[in-house]
Amino acid sequence: MLDLSLPSGLRDLLPDHSAHLAELSSKLHDVFSRFGYRRVFLPTLERLDVVERGLSPAALADVMKFVEPGSGEVVAIRPDITPQIARLYAARPDALPSPARLCYDGPVLRAREARAGRPREVYQAGVELLGAGGASADAEALVLLARSLERVGLKAPRVEVGHARFAEAVMEAARLPERLRSAAWEALSRKDRAALAAAAAKGRGSAEAREAVPQLAGLFGDGALDRARAIARAVPEAAAPLAETEAALRIARRRGVREVAVDLGEARGLGYYTGITFAGYAPGAGAAVARGGRYDGLLARFGRPGPAIGFAVDLEFATQALERVNGRGRGVRPRRASARGGRARARPR
């Protein structure tokens, strides 16, 4: 008997669900276009060496690769679209002068499951601002994310802002032993003050830096910026990341973005993001509906160095939020993947 089931972690999208995702993508591209972003379409397959340049070593396990029968080249199914944008930007400086504002949508496929009930093929829509640095570009991305979440109809969306280098500066100043660094970052991701304090006690840095390490777990919520300023006074290496964050927030707030939270103890994206990071949340979504940040090191890997910042919206999580809070889309909720499959993130978006 013919087995009509799909491979693990994949699913079909029926007409109603497909129409809803298409509507979300269309609304997002309306906003992207108003901000001056131009749409590009990119292939599902890339040469493996191109994909590898855009991912961290840990993320390479998410890549599905095979030998292309015609050419014998090793190719990969894209686990992320940003490396493709970087490759395009480097390959076509004639058509894409700096700064370039590009937007996209499409599926990405990951090899590993990240959480039960989530498919490995994920539909995204996103933007990349290439060749522009500084607080103005950071704020542009923040404002665009906030406007995008509002445009798709999410109720009470919230943007959370961090900085990849703030916690890193404190950790480095504390001079933790090599054997404890990974555990300290894991503890920070759990907001585990006790574990952070235990690791910091074995550091060889200044007393001020060692005392600041467990405080990183509390740099969210009301008063987070005040607590971060106190840390930056004690650990001067953290002052520049804090100043960059506050500068972007000031501009974004002048442009009308009000629902912004801060978490400067965010550990996500270490080794990939180089500056401000952000995530978009909405009541009813199982996780962040969007993630992004500044990744100034990526473009140089493709031969056209420069600053870059962007974000991607997870259309499935946005759909969930609309269904559960706004009461829209009833009857088109995506079917849960079997226990055999799930989703894995190729990088920190």
Curated annotation (Swiss-Prot):
Pathway: Amino-acid biosynthesis; L-histidine biosynthesis; L-histidine from 5-phospho-alpha-D-ribose 1-diphosphate: step 1/9
InterPro entries hit by this protein: aa-tRNA-synth_II, aa-tRNA-synth_II/BPL/LPL, HisRS-like_core, HisRS/HisZ, HisZ
GO molecular function terms listed in the Swiss-Prot or TrEMBL record: histidine-tRNA ligase activity
Region (Disordered): 327-349
Feature: compositional bias, Basic residues: 330-349
GO cellular component, one term: cytoplasm
Keyword annotations of the record: Amino-acid biosynthesis, Cytoplasm, Histidine biosynthesis
Cell location: Cytoplasm
Pfam families: tRNA-synt_His
PANTHER family: HISTIDINE--TRNA LIGASE, MITOCHONDRIAL-RELATED, HISTIDYL-TRNA SYNTHETASE
Function of the molecule: Required for the first step of histidine biosynthesis. May allow the feedback regulation of ATP phosphoribosyltransferase activity by histidine.
Note: This function is generally fulfilled by the C-terminal part of HisG, which is missing in some bacteria such as this one.
Protein name: ATP phosphoribosyltransferase regulatory subunit
Organism, scientific name: Anaeromyxobacter sp. (strain K)
Source taxonomy: Bacteria, Pseudomonadati, Myxococcota, Myxococcia, Myxococcales
Originating gene: hisZ
